[in-house]
Amino acid sequence: MANPDNRNNNVERLKQMVRNTKAKMEAANEALAHEEMNAEERQRTEEKNNRRKQSLDAFESEILDEQSARINDDEV
């Protein structure tokens, strides 16, 4: 039998993912500012941060969806 869709902690889990991603971005920005990197390493780090930014946007959107679903579930 399939597991039921348990969405109880999705918002909290997503918020933790946002915090973790922001921390990684900050660490990467610190490295870019203070460490000597060759052009390839710098480009890879900048590209990673661009992907992280896209992930943050997706997380924020998903948080809104989950909060809306939670409100709708409470109204039922």
Curated annotation (Swiss-Prot):
It comes from the Bacteria. Its main location: other. Residues 27-49, 67-76 have a biased composition (Basic and acidic residues). Keywords: Sporulation. One of its GO terms (biological process) is sporulation resulting in formation of a cellular spore. It is found in: Spore core. Pfam families: Tlp. The keyword Electron transport does not apply. Residues 27-76 are annotated as: Disordered. InterPro entries: SASP_thioredoxin-like. Induction: Expressed only in the forespore compartment of sporulating cells. Belongs to the Tlp family. This is Small, acid-soluble spore protein Tlp.
